[in-house]
């Protein structure tokens, strides 16, 4: 992969990560448009590095909020911060389990399969449209909600 392709994909990742769209799906489309012919393992490594960079930049931007939440969590008392971190951890479980046990199958299924990636982006768009039209109850996220969010993210 040329450095210019890497730069373009890095910019694409940076723009789409914080939008309610699949940045991973857009990366796959971007790789296809740029004619990326790298091996699946190299492609996956590149995607992981981009996501790591995004996570690192997010930590830098939200460092004060993260510090406050961690400070509350480290008091070892059941409070709003410990509940928040518990819900985040619970929401990560489905993706972690699927990623650990089905990594190769997922890479074969989605890696370079632009038609499937495009179809999944359309499905995601429809779900976001329906969620936007749903009645807003302003309720707090429950543990069940956190788990369902994790399943949705894993899919």
Q: Across the structure, where does each feature detected by a protein language model lie?
A:
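Multi-pass membrane proteins that catalyze or facilitate reactions on polyprenyl-/lipid-phosphate substrates
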Residues: 1-155
